[in-house]
Amino acid sequence: MMKQISILGSTGSIGRQTLEVVNSFPEELNVVALAAGRNRELFLEQCKAYKPLLVSLQLEEDALWLKEHLIKEKLRPEIRYGLDGLVAVATCHEAVVVVTALSGAIGLVPTCAAIKASKKIALANKETLVAAGQYVTKLAEEYKVEILPVDSEHSAIWQCLHGENRSAIRKIQLTASGGPFRQLNRQELENVTPEMALKHPNWSMGQKITIDSATLMNKGLEVIEAKWLFGVDYDDINVVVHPQSVIHSMVEYGDGSLLAHLGMPDMRIPIQYALSYPERWFNHLPKLNLTELKGLTFEEPDTNRFPSLSLAYQAGKIGGTAPAVLNAANEVAVHAFLAGQIKFMQIPSIVKRTLNEHQFQGSPVLEEILEIDGWAREEANKIIRNC
């Protein structure tokens, strides 16, 4: 039976790779709704190729431009824009699965709307669970909605848990490549430029997540995401640097068994599994050749050089609104770094200072989380202006 899917963030890295998976399985997958940000030219081509019923762009002017160009192609989907447009795509009646491939906390509201519409969630937008993990997981439980992880590490953990008793878990071993600056000293890190940071050694990703990988904040966000996806305490989630990115994560059980998920560093594999689950579909992607591996190495992350990882653990353990502040401040700091406004090593400093200014709240509802998100962005921007 063909699965009807909506994609939030179709012009981003994960969105484009999701469409590549769709192209490989034309009998199994069909796109019924698409949403994107500002890349209207690429979005136009996607609309022409997939002919969705409902589409949305960030700005009204881009939506009007899109409508004009689609009419020329004799295509007349429903066209929306802004946050209302994201929610419309997330709740599209025909869709069974919603791929949340947006970058940042902007994914929170449409993801919650999709859950309330009883859509299955293929989650690539980790910031949703970072900012509002307790709220979102309770909402999913209330509406009996499955959240299927798309992140390679969480997909790996999920697969290592199949058929196992969660109470038998001793530790989750979350692997990290270590990023492009794993071997740089503190002084060298001070001189890192955006161009240097955007060259990830193993993965093809968007700009924001690539910078997060370089600071190890991405791994910190994944720790918080893992806590909510799998119900494991922070003390039982361990990060290990694995530069080859062959083992995508591991689950250690109480009897001493360690189950690992191995594969090529290709995001299309976990995307495909989230869309095919509970089945596995054959594909023509490059396969891992064990005899070609020169070795698998592991090391402890250096939180002195990369303090973002420790900040994420601290915020996660505080709970409540702390992870939302962490996430929002980090988004602002990363964008400031990409714009040349701050140095690489100022990113964690700005996040820490924003966290220190916040009065934490426990068990916030969605409206409170969104309010705190806005406050944290303003506070981080204020700190940046005074740098």
Curated annotation (Swiss-Prot):
The catalytic activity, as recorded, is: 2-C-methyl-D-erythritol 4-phosphate + NADP(+) = 1-deoxy-D-xylulose 5-phosphate + NADPH + H(+)
* Chain residues that bind 1-deoxy-D-xylulose 5-phosphate: 126, 152-153, 177, 200, 213, 218-219, 222
User: What is its pathway?
Assistant: Isoprenoid biosynthesis; isopentenyl diphosphate biosynthesis via DXP pathway; isopentenyl diphosphate from 1-deoxy-D-xylulose 5-phosphate: step 1/6
Q: Which GO terms describe its molecular function?
A: 1-deoxy-D-xylulose-5-phosphate reductoisomerase activity; manganese ion binding; NADPH binding
Alphabetical keyword list? Isoprene biosynthesis, Manganese, Metal-binding, NADP, Oxidoreductase
**Keyword Iron assigned:** no
Check the record and name the InterPro entries matching this protein.
DXP_reductoisomerase, DXP_reductoisomerase_C, DXP_reductoisomerase_N, DXPR_C, DXPR_C_sf, NAD(P)-bd_dom_sf
Oxidoreductase: is it a keyword of this entry? yes
Q: Which positions are annotated as binding NADPH?
A: 11-14, 37-39, 125, 127, 206
Q: Which residues bind Mn(2+)?
A: 151, 153, 222
Provide an example Pfam family for this protein: DXPR_C
EC number from the UniProt entry: 1.1.1.267
GO BP annotations of the record are:
isopentenyl diphosphate biosynthetic process, methylerythritol 4-phosphate pathway involved in terpenoid biosynthetic process
What cofactor is this protein dependent on?
A: Mg(2+); Mn(2+)
What does this chain do? Catalyzes the NADPH-dependent rearrangement and reduction of 1-deoxy-D-xylulose-5-phosphate (DXP) to 2-C-methyl-D-erythritol 4-phosphate (MEP).
Its family remark reads: Belongs to the DXR family.
Output this protein's name.
1-deoxy-D-xylulose 5-phosphate reductoisomerase
Instruction: Name the source organism.
Output: Desulforamulus reducens (strain ATCC BAA-1160 / DSM 100696 / MI-1)
